[in-house]
């Protein structure tokens, strides 16, 4: 992974953490860059394991690409009130939107 990719990924994770903290979640960043989830958000009634992706390439949204990530998350243990989610930040000049793919 290039330094630029790491930088964009870290920026995406930072923005996701801020958004969740603003919604009242306690947010913990996963220790390793190769773990299944990037951040864990703990709320009053739920816990969310989130894989954050940042892309300027619309191909990231193709079903086959997302399915590979979904399959990894789908097989993980799932305690009550725990959800796995994929958050994608589409970062293209003039278009910086979050696209949510929840409940894997």
Sequence positions of predicted segments:
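Conserved catalytic cores of phosphodiester-cleaving nucleases, focusing on short active-site segments
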Residues: 20, 39-41, 45-57
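Domain-level recognition of nuclease-like catalytic cores that cleave nucleotide substrates
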Residues: 7, 78-104
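Acidic-basic catalytic patches of nuclease active cores, encompassing PD-(D/E)XK
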Residues: 1-30
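Structural signal for conserved beta-strand scaffold positions within catalytic alpha/beta enzyme cores
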Residues: 29, 51, 86-88
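Short connector loops at helix/strand junctions that flank enzyme active sites
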Residues: 34-36, 45-49, 79-82
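Active-site-adjacent loop/helix micro-motif of nuclease/hydrolase catalytic cores
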Residues: 56-69
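Active-site metal-binding core of divalent-cation-utilizing nuclease and nuclease-like domains
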Residues: 22-36, 40-44
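A short, charged, amphipathic alpha-helix used as a generic interaction element across diverse proteins
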Residues: 71-73
């Amino acid at each position: 992974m290039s330094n630029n990719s790491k930088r964009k990924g870290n920026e995406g994770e930072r923005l996701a953490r801020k958004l969740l903290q603003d919604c009242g979640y306690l947010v913990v960043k996963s220790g390793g860059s190769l773990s299944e989830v990037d951040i864990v958000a703990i709320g009053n009634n739920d816990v969310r394991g989130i894989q954050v992706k940042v892309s300027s390439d619309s191909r990231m949204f193709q079903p086959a690409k997302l399915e590979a990530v979904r399959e990894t998350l789908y097989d993980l243990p799932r305690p009550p009130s725990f959800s796995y989610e994929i958050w994608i930040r589409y970062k293209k000049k003039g278009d910086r939107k979050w696209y949510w793919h929840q409940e894997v």
